[in-house]
């Protein structure tokens, strides 16, 4: 289906694609077409499953050989992980049968605003672009280019329209091109050499005197930083590429020797390093002195790294828990300043997780400093290195804590923000692709539970495949109690949110019963599993029969008896067991099974010992913010349901 702004021609389906078998374009819906780029057409599409918008650049190739060469050359783009480079999701080759042409397709991030549009808007308004903002963007672009050049990758198509703005102060490079495709001179001459900028560049190269005129005009007009540009442009416009200024020289001229400023502190990597012996000597003091060193040497990543390592080894009493606001602030600032350095991100996340964990253990009543800065910093780290498993586990664990530690209104806001950022889809993608990584699965399920806890779901569609994903996870880790516990929590919340389809009820009930049998000693697992069972049984007689039917390992009713005997002194567990019995007893066909299984004696004992606590309005069965779908109907308390069961003959 084509969007209203489309040009009316739908691409035919792909034939080959390393990232997706069969027909890759089948999983995308074309919404509209952007202005053509230098070498191809840019389509804004939506993934059919996740509803996430992407950009697909389609480049027409002369033949199969050229397409295959270009695909091979561009495959390294899939591994690029940098805060200021757009993530490439997929590359594939497709055949357009309508015009008998072969296309290379590059699937990239979608962002509405580019630097080109900022320039055009300022021209229309006859306004000057803020110099400090421009310098900050330039620093990020240079940082990204240095990273690419370090990997021997050349952008080949750098221009304002290929600098996208993720936010007001964060840009990314996109639309890297291939040397193979750039050799198509006919297409390149038509689309690229006809621009005013290209004519100007050729003119300046051919006539050095004209460049002097331009620079003199800039000086006369008092253009900001004209002197810096005067030092840069002659070297950048050399005809022979080997004579041109390198990216490191550009950084040195603009940010180290010049007056430019940028928040992209990886540029400070060009400074001389501080010897480890001196760093260790500076870090011998207490927390206050270490923080002072970190602040005084904020631009030296090696100092920041060793300082955080030192803090990680400190005992809780020296760290000053529950919270030292200045410590958290310095760590977050370090993450933001050194977003290019993976070791810094890993160490900072480990330290934040350590601080959160220690504070919750030693001071459970203390509220964490889970402010926007922490969430933003760790989320930025995740997007910069989305496939780095060790970082992914740390970030998932941190976000799970920060989301649940906020007040209810703040937590809902954070949960919505994270969902809008695509975190839900990210979790599901990695539960599927990283099934062999236990830590990814456990932390992913924990964060999924935290996002679902408030019941504010931006888009329920992706959640429909969660039961099947969890089934795969539990099949992979059949004896893992922690995995089962995390899974039961997610199943319970999904049942309350109505995100489990009727055809999935039997499967989910079986998995919940299996988890209880596996880990009767885990109270949290038991509570969440029985809550999930009660929620499903309330709305489905099929689920109720699945609980009571005799299967391998015994029936659910015998399991209920075992649970009660093990946890009879825990009111919360007994309440959740009682709620399940109430919903089972609401089906006439199930009542005979309850009686024949000698459940009346158990029910009588629960009634006598816990009647006062078995009131649904005060039950842990319902969580604030969650819809009432899994809760008893008004007036239907557990104690009332148990009365009916006892009276049944």
From Swiss-Prot:
SMART domains: S_TKc (SM00220). Signal peptide: none annotated. InterPro entries: ARM-type_fold (IPR016024), Kinase-like_dom_sf (IPR011009), Prot_kinase_dom (IPR000719). The protein kinase domain is predicted to be catalytically inactive. It comes from the Eukaryota. Residues 1-13 have a biased composition (Basic and acidic residues). ATP binds at residues 34-42, 57. It comes from Macaca fascicularis. The keyword Nucleotide-binding applies. This is Serine/threonine kinase-like domain-containing protein STKLD1. Residues 1-23, 621-640 are annotated as: Disordered. SUPFAM superfamilies: ARM repeat (SSF48371), Protein kinase-like (PK-like) (SSF56112). Transmembrane segments: none annotated. Belongs to the protein kinase superfamily. Ser/Thr protein kinase family. STKL subfamily. One of its GO terms (molecular function) is ATP binding. The keyword Nucleotide-binding applies. Coiled coil: none annotated. Keywords: ATP-binding, Nucleotide-binding. Residues 28-379 form the Protein kinase domain. Pfam families: Pkinase (PF00069).
């Amino acid at each position: 289906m084509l969007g209203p702004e489309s040009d009316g021609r739908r691409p035919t389906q792909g034939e080959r694609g390393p990232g997706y078998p069969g027909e890759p374009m089948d999983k995308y819906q074309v919404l509209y077409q952007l202005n053509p780029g230098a070498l191809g057409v840019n389509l804004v599409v939506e993934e059919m499953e996740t509803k996430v918008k992407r950009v697909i650049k389609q480049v027409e190739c002369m033949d199969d050989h050229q397409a295959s060469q270009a695909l091979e050359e561009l495959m390294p783009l899939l591994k690029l992980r940098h805060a200021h480079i757009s993530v490439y999701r997929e590359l594939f080759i497709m055949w357009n049968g309508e015009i008998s042409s072969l296309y290379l397709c590059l699937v990239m991030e979608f962002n509405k605003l580019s630097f080109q549009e900022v320039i055009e808007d300022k021209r229309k308004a006859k306004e000057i672009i803020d110099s400090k903002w421009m310098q900050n963007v330039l620093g990020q672009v240079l940082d990204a280019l240095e990273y690419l050049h370090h990997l021997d990758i050349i952008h080949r198509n750098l221009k304002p329209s290929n600098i996208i703005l993720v936010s007001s102060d964060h840009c990314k490079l996109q639309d890297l091109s291939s040397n193979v495709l750039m050799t198509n001179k006919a297409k390149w001459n038509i689309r690229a050499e006809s621009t005013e900028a290209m004519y100007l560049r050729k003119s300046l190269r051919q006539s050095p005197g004209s460049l002097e005129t331009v620079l003199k005009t800039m000086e006369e007009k008092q253009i900001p930083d004209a002197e810096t540009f005067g030092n840069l442009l002659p070297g950048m416009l050399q005809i022979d590429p080997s004579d041109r200024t390198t990216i490191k020289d550009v950084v040195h001229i603009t940010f180290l020797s010049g007056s430019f400023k940028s928040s992209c502190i990886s540029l400070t990597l060009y400074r001389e390093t501080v010897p480890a012996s001196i760093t260790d000597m500076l870090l011998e003091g207490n927390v206050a002195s270490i923080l002072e060193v970190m602040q005084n040497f904020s631009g030296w990543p090696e100092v920041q790294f060793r300082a955080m390592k030192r803090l990680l080894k400190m005992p809780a009493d020296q760290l000053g828990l529950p919270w030292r606001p200045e410590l958290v602030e310095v760590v977050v600032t370090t993450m933001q300043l050194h977003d290019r350095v993976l070791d810094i991100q890993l160490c900072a996340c480990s330290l934040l997780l350590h601080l959160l964990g220690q504070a919750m253990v030693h001071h459970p009543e203390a509220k964490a400093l889970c402010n926007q800065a922490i969430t933003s910093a760790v989320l930025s780290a995740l997007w910069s290195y989305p496939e780095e498993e060790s970082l992914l586990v740390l970030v998932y664990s941190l976000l799970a804590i920060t989301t649940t530690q906020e007040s209810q209104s703040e937590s809902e806001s954070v949960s919505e923000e994270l969902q809008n950022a695509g975190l839900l889809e990210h979790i599901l993608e990695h539960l599927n692709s990283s099934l062999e990584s236990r830590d990814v699965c456990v932390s992913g399920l924990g964060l999924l539970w935290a996002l679902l806890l408030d019941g504010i779901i931006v888009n329920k569609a992706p959640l429909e495949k969660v039961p099947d994903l969890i089934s795969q996870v539990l099949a992979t880790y059949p004896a893992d109690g922690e995995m089962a516990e995390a899974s039961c929590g997610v199943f319970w919340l999904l049942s309350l949110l109505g995100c489990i389809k009727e055809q999935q009820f039997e499967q989910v009930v079986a998995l919940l019963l299996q988890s209880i049998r596996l880990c009767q000693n885990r109270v949290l697992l038991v509570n969440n599993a029985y809550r999930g069972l009660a929620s499903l049984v309330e709305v489905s007689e099929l689920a109720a029969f699945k609980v009571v039917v005799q299967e391998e390992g015994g029936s659910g009713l015998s399991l209920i008896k075992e649970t009660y005997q093990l946890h009879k002194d825990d009111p919360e567990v007994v309440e959740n067991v009682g709620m399940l019995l109430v919903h089972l007893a609401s089906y006439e066909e199930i009542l005979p099974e309850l009686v024949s299984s000698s459940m009346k004696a158990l029910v009588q004992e629960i009634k006598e010992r816990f009647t006062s606590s078995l009131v649904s309005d005060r039950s842990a069965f319902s969580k604030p913010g969650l819809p009432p779908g899994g809760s008893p109907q008004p007036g239907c308390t557990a104690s009332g349901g148990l009365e009916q069961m006892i009276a049944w003959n």
